[in-house]
Design a protein with these regions (language model features):
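Signature of the first transmembrane helix
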Residues: 3-62, 102-106, 133, 231-260, ...
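Hydrophobic alpha-helical transmembrane segments
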Residues: 128, 159-209, 265-270
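Helix-loop junctions and terminal segments of transmembrane helices
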Residues: 27, 57-74, 149, 269, ...
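Membrane-water interface segments that mark the loop-to-transmembrane alpha-helix transition
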Residues: 6-19, 45, 57-113, 125-128
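Interhelical loop/hinge segments that connect adjacent transmembrane helices in multipass membrane
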Residues: 1-4, 182-189, 198-247
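Alpha-helical transmembrane segments of multi-pass membrane proteins
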Residues: 51, 103, 118-143, 194
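Membrane-interface junctions at transmembrane-helix termini in multi-pass inner-membrane proteins
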Residues: 5, 136-160
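Interfacial segments at transmembrane-helix termini and the short loops linking adjacent helices
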Residues: 36-37, 109-130, 260
Length: 284
């Protein structure tokens, strides 16, 4: 059995295990121990962070998949210096995007607070907690994609589908049994994604297939490739507005116009619909 087929099967198993954890969390923990408003708060924070990283990464995840073969030194196989500093730029580009959209997000605090404030003041209170959560989610994704293009799929998927969900389950239970205040609950949610990011980062560095040093000579000799990369990234940023906004738009409108209680109800209903997409997710 080839490595791709083997990892695909293992990845599918991991995905279904993650679904099982998510099912238990959603239908036996959230609905029993948390109020609709608390469920809604966690949902809208995660949705806001998801929207943020979809824009802030500046198309880096797709660019990694598209351009890594052009940077990889095929003569050296999978040695640590084989990507001509490509990994370095996959860290820098989203960092620039994060800084840019952080400034925009902070500038929008007042108008968004007015929009959400009447029906969902609790979200306004934790408005800035979206930023650290988004940062951790952003680099969790970047590290995962870098591992995937190096044909290491199972562990990053286990982090995304299992470790993250188990971490969220633990946080929900700690809050349910009053081991955490609402402030601690929100901080712990961010902490789950911080742990996931560190797991992916540690795994990627343990492979010994990456280097942080940029290869300036390679960039000077391949300026056309760099222009193609920038053009491709620009198109991805435009398309990300629609592709990332569409799945989260309903959550934001419900939160602003109806309140977090309804967002919580919507989150439970959405999870049922998401289960239909399991076969697709197991292949991505």
């Amino acid at each position: 059995m080839g490595i791709i087929a083997k990892q695909s099967i293992q990845g599918t198993i991991v995905t279904y295990l993650g679904v099982a954890v998510g099912f238990v969390t959603t239908f036996f923990v959230l609905t029993r121990f948390l109020s609709a408003e608390e469920i809604g708060l966690s949902r809208v924070l995660i949705d806001a962070a998801t929207l943020f990283i979809g824009l802030a990464q500046l198309g880096t995840s797709s660019s990694i998949i598209r351009f890594y073969p052009h940077f990889r030194n095929k003569e050296q196989g999978t040695k640590s210096q084989d990507d001509h500093g490509f990994f370095f730029w996959t860290l820098i580009v989203p960092l620039v995007g994060f800084a840019l959209f952080t400034a925009i997000y902070c500038a929008c605090h007042e108008p968004l607070s007015r929009w959400f404030g009447e029906k969902s003041p609790l979200f306004v209170e934790y408005y800035y907690m979206v930023l650290p959560m988004a940062f951790f989610m952003l680099y969790q994704t970047i590290f995962e994609t870098n591992a995937n293009v190096r044909m290491h799929i199972v562990v990053p998927r286990a982090v995304r589908e299992l470790i993250t969900r188990i971490g969220l389950l633990v946080v929900y239970l700690l809050y349910a049994f009053e081991c955490l205040t609402i402030n601690g609950f929100v901080v712990a949610l961010c902490g789950v994604y911080a742990v996931a990011m560190l797991c992916n980062m540690g795994y990627l560095f343990s492979l010994g297939e990456i280097a942080l040093r940029p290869d300036w000579e390679f960039l000077r000799n391949n300026r056309l490739l760099i222009r193609q990369y920038l053009l491709y990234t620009g198109f991805l940023l435009i398309s990300a507005v629609a592709s990332v906004l569409a799945p989260t738009l309903s959550s934001f409108f419900i939160t602003a116009e109806m309140g977090l209680n309804y967002t919580g109800i919507f989150a439970i209903a959405t999870y049922i619909a998401v289960m239909v997409s399991i076969p697709y997710r197991s292949m991505t």
